[in-house]
Amino acid sequence: MNIQQIRNATLKITYAGRTFLVDPWLAGKGETGTFRSLGGVFRCKDGTWDIPMPMCDLPFPREDILKGVDACICTHVHPDHIDISPDGTIGAALDSTLPLFVQSMEDAHAFVRSGFRDVTVMYENSRFDDILLVRVPARHGTKIPCGPACGVILHHPDEPVLYLAGDTIWYDAVAQTLRRWRPGVIVLNACAAFLLDEGRLIMDDADVEKVVRACDGAAVIVSHMDNVAHATISRADMKKRLAERGLETRVIMPDDGQILTFPADR
Protein backbone atom coordinates (compact mmCIF):
# COMPACT_ATOMS: atom_id res chain seq x y z
CA MET A 1 0.00 0.00 0.00
CA ASN A 2 1.19 3.49 -0.89
CA ILE A 3 -0.40 6.63 0.52
CA GLN A 4 0.61 9.94 -1.00
CA GLN A 5 -0.33 13.09 0.88
CA ILE A 6 -1.41 15.55 -1.82
CA ARG A 7 -2.81 18.53 0.09
CA ASN A 8 -5.28 19.01 2.91
CA ALA A 9 -7.42 15.81 2.99
CA THR A 10 -6.59 14.88 -0.60
CA LEU A 11 -4.75 11.56 -0.78
CA LYS A 12 -3.62 9.34 -3.63
CA ILE A 13 -3.74 5.76 -2.42
CA THR A 14 -2.54 2.64 -4.22
CA TYR A 15 -4.23 -0.33 -2.57
CA ALA A 16 -4.33 -3.92 -3.86
CA GLY A 17 -3.16 -2.76 -7.26
CA ARG A 18 -5.76 0.00 -7.66
CA THR A 19 -5.26 3.74 -7.25
CA PHE A 20 -7.84 5.89 -5.44
CA LEU A 21 -7.95 9.67 -5.23
CA VAL A 22 -9.58 10.65 -1.94
CA ASP A 23 -11.35 13.98 -1.37
CA PRO A 24 -9.97 15.59 -4.55
CA TRP A 25 -9.84 19.32 -3.74
CA LEU A 26 -7.72 20.38 -6.71
CA ALA A 27 -8.18 24.16 -6.82
CA GLY A 28 -5.09 26.33 -7.11
CA LYS A 29 -3.86 28.37 -4.16
CA GLY A 30 -6.57 30.78 -3.04
CA GLU A 31 -9.00 29.80 -5.80
CA THR A 32 -11.78 28.48 -3.55
CA GLY A 33 -12.05 31.89 -1.89
CA THR A 34 -12.61 33.05 1.68
CA PHE A 35 -15.28 32.37 4.26
CA ARG A 36 -16.68 35.81 3.44
CA SER A 37 -16.81 35.07 -0.30
CA LEU A 38 -18.49 31.72 0.39
CA GLY A 39 -21.52 33.68 1.57
CA GLY A 40 -21.13 33.70 5.34
CA VAL A 41 -22.80 30.30 5.71
CA PHE A 42 -20.30 29.38 8.42
CA ARG A 43 -19.36 31.67 11.32
CA CYS A 44 -15.66 31.60 12.13
CA LYS A 45 -13.32 33.46 14.46
CA ASP A 46 -12.26 37.03 13.74
CA GLY A 47 -9.18 37.14 11.56
CA THR A 48 -10.11 34.12 9.47
CA TRP A 49 -12.93 35.58 7.34
CA ASP A 50 -10.68 36.92 4.61
CA ILE A 51 -7.94 34.28 4.31
CA PRO A 52 -8.02 32.75 0.80
CA MET A 53 -8.16 28.97 0.59
CA PRO A 54 -6.52 26.64 -0.14
CA MET A 55 -3.60 28.31 1.61
CA CYS A 56 -0.96 26.31 -0.29
CA ASP A 57 -0.72 25.28 -3.91
CA LEU A 58 -0.76 21.69 -5.09
CA PRO A 59 2.64 19.97 -4.83
CA PHE A 60 2.43 18.82 -8.46
CA PRO A 61 0.54 19.82 -11.60
CA ARG A 62 -3.08 18.71 -11.48
CA GLU A 63 -2.65 16.39 -14.46
CA ASP A 64 0.13 14.50 -12.64
CA ILE A 65 -2.10 14.02 -9.60
CA LEU A 66 -4.89 12.63 -11.78
CA LYS A 67 -2.59 10.34 -13.76
CA GLY A 68 -3.23 6.65 -13.12
CA VAL A 69 -6.29 7.16 -10.91
CA ASP A 70 -8.77 4.26 -11.12
CA ALA A 71 -11.51 5.64 -8.85
CA CYS A 72 -12.32 8.52 -6.50
CA ILE A 73 -13.68 8.55 -2.96
CA CYS A 74 -15.44 11.68 -1.70
CA THR A 75 -16.17 11.46 2.03
CA HIS A 76 -18.48 14.50 1.90
CA VAL A 77 -19.29 17.49 -0.27
CA HIS A 78 -17.59 20.43 1.45
CA PRO A 79 -15.49 22.99 -0.44
CA ASP A 80 -12.24 21.84 1.20
CA HIS A 81 -12.82 18.24 0.02
CA ILE A 82 -14.18 18.66 -3.51
CA ASP A 83 -14.09 21.60 -5.91
CA ILE A 84 -17.44 23.42 -6.04
CA SER A 85 -18.01 25.69 -9.04
CA PRO A 86 -20.00 28.97 -8.88
CA ASP A 87 -22.93 27.24 -10.60
CA GLY A 88 -23.05 24.61 -7.84
CA THR A 89 -21.60 21.74 -9.86
CA ILE A 90 -18.77 19.77 -8.30
CA GLY A 91 -15.58 17.99 -9.28
CA ALA A 92 -14.86 19.97 -12.46
CA ALA A 93 -11.21 18.81 -12.59
CA LEU A 94 -12.14 15.12 -12.57
CA ASP A 95 -12.85 12.80 -15.49
CA SER A 96 -16.63 12.36 -15.33
CA THR A 97 -16.29 8.69 -16.34
CA LEU A 98 -14.21 7.76 -13.28
CA PRO A 99 -15.94 5.47 -10.78
CA LEU A 100 -16.81 7.58 -7.75
CA PHE A 101 -17.72 6.43 -4.22
CA VAL A 102 -19.75 8.66 -1.89
CA GLN A 103 -21.45 8.58 1.50
CA SER A 104 -25.11 9.19 0.59
CA MET A 105 -27.76 9.42 -2.10
CA GLU A 106 -27.75 13.20 -1.62
CA ASP A 107 -24.04 13.39 -2.48
CA ALA A 108 -24.54 10.91 -5.34
CA HIS A 109 -27.24 13.12 -6.85
CA ALA A 110 -24.91 16.14 -6.62
CA PHE A 111 -22.27 14.29 -8.64
CA VAL A 112 -24.79 12.97 -11.17
CA ARG A 113 -26.13 16.51 -11.67
CA SER A 114 -22.51 17.52 -12.32
CA GLY A 115 -22.18 15.00 -15.14
CA PHE A 116 -20.63 11.99 -13.41
CA ARG A 117 -21.81 8.67 -14.80
CA ASP A 118 -20.56 6.00 -12.37
CA VAL A 119 -21.44 6.98 -8.80
CA THR A 120 -21.82 4.43 -5.99
CA VAL A 121 -23.10 5.03 -2.46
CA MET A 122 -20.92 3.09 -0.02
CA TYR A 123 -22.59 0.68 2.36
CA GLU A 124 -21.36 -2.40 4.28
CA ASN A 125 -20.50 -4.47 1.22
CA SER A 126 -19.54 -1.98 -1.50
CA ARG A 127 -16.69 -3.11 -3.72
CA PHE A 128 -14.33 -1.82 -6.34
CA ASP A 129 -13.06 -4.95 -8.07
CA ASP A 130 -12.11 -7.17 -5.12
CA ILE A 131 -11.52 -4.30 -2.67
CA LEU A 132 -14.16 -3.87 0.03
CA LEU A 133 -15.16 -0.25 0.67
CA VAL A 134 -17.20 0.28 3.84
CA ARG A 135 -18.70 3.57 4.94
CA VAL A 136 -18.26 4.09 8.69
CA PRO A 137 -19.63 6.82 10.97
CA ALA A 138 -18.08 10.24 11.54
CA ARG A 139 -19.16 13.20 13.68
CA HIS A 140 -18.18 16.50 12.08
CA GLY A 141 -18.40 18.85 15.09
CA THR A 142 -18.21 18.92 18.89
CA LYS A 143 -21.33 21.10 19.29
CA ILE A 144 -23.45 20.26 16.27
CA PRO A 145 -22.34 18.42 13.12
CA CYS A 146 -21.16 20.65 10.30
CA GLY A 147 -23.20 18.56 7.88
CA PRO A 148 -22.96 14.81 7.28
CA ALA A 149 -19.56 13.18 6.82
CA CYS A 150 -18.18 9.66 6.86
CA GLY A 151 -15.09 7.56 7.28
CA VAL A 152 -14.12 4.71 4.96
CA ILE A 153 -12.62 1.27 5.54
CA LEU A 154 -10.63 -0.34 2.71
CA HIS A 155 -10.16 -4.10 3.06
CA HIS A 156 -8.37 -6.67 0.90
CA PRO A 157 -6.73 -9.95 1.96
CA ASP A 158 -3.37 -8.89 0.49
CA GLU A 159 -3.24 -5.51 2.28
CA PRO A 160 -3.50 -4.10 5.80
CA VAL A 161 -6.95 -2.78 6.67
CA LEU A 162 -6.94 0.96 5.96
CA TYR A 163 -9.17 3.32 7.97
CA LEU A 164 -9.75 6.79 6.56
CA ALA A 165 -11.43 8.45 9.53
CA GLY A 166 -12.64 11.43 7.50
CA ASP A 167 -13.82 14.68 9.04
CA THR A 168 -14.61 13.56 12.56
CA ILE A 169 -13.82 14.16 16.18
CA TRP A 170 -13.05 11.31 18.58
CA TYR A 171 -16.29 9.76 19.82
CA ASP A 172 -17.76 6.34 20.54
CA ALA A 173 -18.30 5.34 16.90
CA VAL A 174 -14.62 5.93 16.08
CA ALA A 175 -13.63 3.69 18.98
CA GLN A 176 -16.10 1.06 17.76
CA THR A 177 -14.66 1.20 14.24
CA LEU A 178 -11.17 0.62 15.65
CA ARG A 179 -12.35 -2.36 17.71
CA ARG A 180 -14.31 -3.93 14.88
CA TRP A 181 -11.86 -3.53 12.00
CA ARG A 182 -8.48 -3.45 13.80
CA PRO A 183 -6.90 -1.38 11.02
CA GLY A 184 -3.19 -1.61 10.31
CA VAL A 185 -3.07 1.93 8.90
CA ILE A 186 -5.20 4.90 10.02
CA VAL A 187 -5.47 8.37 8.49
CA LEU A 188 -6.77 11.16 10.75
CA ASN A 189 -7.86 14.64 9.69
CA ALA A 190 -6.45 16.67 12.55
CA CYS A 191 -5.95 20.42 12.10
CA ALA A 192 -8.64 21.05 14.77
CA ALA A 193 -10.64 23.29 12.42
CA PHE A 194 -13.13 25.39 14.40
CA LEU A 195 -16.39 27.21 13.68
CA LEU A 196 -18.34 29.22 16.23
CA ASP A 197 -21.65 27.37 15.91
CA GLU A 198 -20.37 23.85 15.31
CA GLY A 199 -17.30 23.91 17.58
CA ARG A 200 -14.18 21.92 16.74
CA LEU A 201 -14.90 20.07 13.50
CA ILE A 202 -12.14 17.46 13.33
CA MET A 203 -9.48 15.95 15.55
CA ASP A 204 -6.87 17.76 17.62
CA ASP A 205 -3.76 16.37 19.30
CA ALA A 206 -5.78 15.02 22.24
CA ASP A 207 -8.03 13.08 19.88
CA VAL A 208 -5.00 11.78 17.98
CA GLU A 209 -3.60 10.46 21.25
CA LYS A 210 -6.88 8.68 21.99
CA VAL A 211 -6.69 6.92 18.62
CA VAL A 212 -3.06 5.92 19.18
CA ARG A 213 -3.85 4.51 22.62
CA ALA A 214 -6.83 2.57 21.22
CA CYS A 215 -5.38 1.19 18.00
CA ASP A 216 -2.88 -1.42 19.23
CA GLY A 217 0.18 -0.60 17.15
CA ALA A 218 -1.37 0.61 13.90
CA ALA A 219 0.44 3.19 11.79
CA VAL A 220 -1.29 6.52 12.45
CA ILE A 221 -1.08 9.30 9.85
CA VAL A 222 -2.12 12.92 10.41
CA SER A 223 -3.59 14.71 7.39
CA HIS A 224 -5.78 17.78 6.57
CA MET A 225 -3.10 20.27 7.64
CA ASP A 226 -2.08 23.85 6.76
CA ASN A 227 -4.69 24.71 4.13
CA VAL A 228 -7.94 25.96 5.67
CA ALA A 229 -8.44 29.32 7.35
CA HIS A 230 -10.35 27.92 10.33
CA ALA A 231 -7.61 25.45 11.34
CA THR A 232 -6.30 25.99 14.86
CA ILE A 233 -3.32 23.61 14.69
CA SER A 234 -0.56 23.76 12.07
CA ARG A 235 1.91 21.01 11.21
CA ALA A 236 4.52 22.79 13.34
CA ASP A 237 2.08 23.06 16.26
CA MET A 238 1.07 19.42 15.93
CA LYS A 239 4.68 18.26 15.89
CA LYS A 240 5.33 20.06 19.20
CA ARG A 241 2.12 18.83 20.78
CA LEU A 242 2.74 15.22 19.80
CA ALA A 243 6.25 15.42 21.24
CA GLU A 244 4.83 16.74 24.51
CA ARG A 245 2.51 13.74 24.58
CA GLY A 246 5.37 11.32 23.85
CA LEU A 247 3.91 10.40 20.46
CA GLU A 248 6.56 11.74 18.11
CA THR A 249 7.57 8.21 17.06
CA ARG A 250 4.01 6.86 16.90
CA VAL A 251 2.43 9.35 14.50
CA ILE A 252 3.43 10.15 10.90
CA MET A 253 2.67 13.61 9.54
CA PRO A 254 3.68 13.65 5.86
CA ASP A 255 4.51 16.76 3.88
CA ASP A 256 2.48 17.55 0.79
CA GLY A 257 3.68 15.28 -2.01
CA GLN A 258 5.27 12.73 0.33
CA ILE A 259 4.61 9.02 -0.28
CA LEU A 260 4.31 6.51 2.57
CA THR A 261 4.62 2.76 1.91
CA PHE A 262 3.22 0.01 4.14
CA PRO A 263 3.93 -3.72 3.72
CA ALA A 264 1.15 -6.26 3.43
CA ASP A 265 1.87 -7.66 6.90
CA ARG A 266 1.51 -4.29 8.63
What are these regions (language model features)?
Residues 21-23, 51-54, 68-80, 101-104, ...:
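Active-site neighborhood of phospho(di)ester-bond hydrolases with catalytic His/Asp-centered motifs
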Residues 102-159, 240-265:
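Metallo-beta-lactamase
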Residues 1, 94-100, 160-162:
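Short active-site oxyanion
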Residues 48, 99-102, 169-256:
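Cap/insert and terminal regions of metallo-dependent hydrolase folds
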Residues 18-73, 84-89, 143, 170-180:
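Pre-active-site segment of Zn-dependent metallo-hydrolases
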Residues 83-92, 106-107, 230-238:
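Metal-dependent catalytic neighborhoods of phosphoester/phosphodiester hydrolases
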Residues 5-18, 26, 127-184, 202-203:
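Catalytic core of the metallo-beta-lactamase
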Residues 27-29, 77-82, 107-110, 126-129, ...:
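Active-site environment of divalent metal-dependent phosphoester hydrolases
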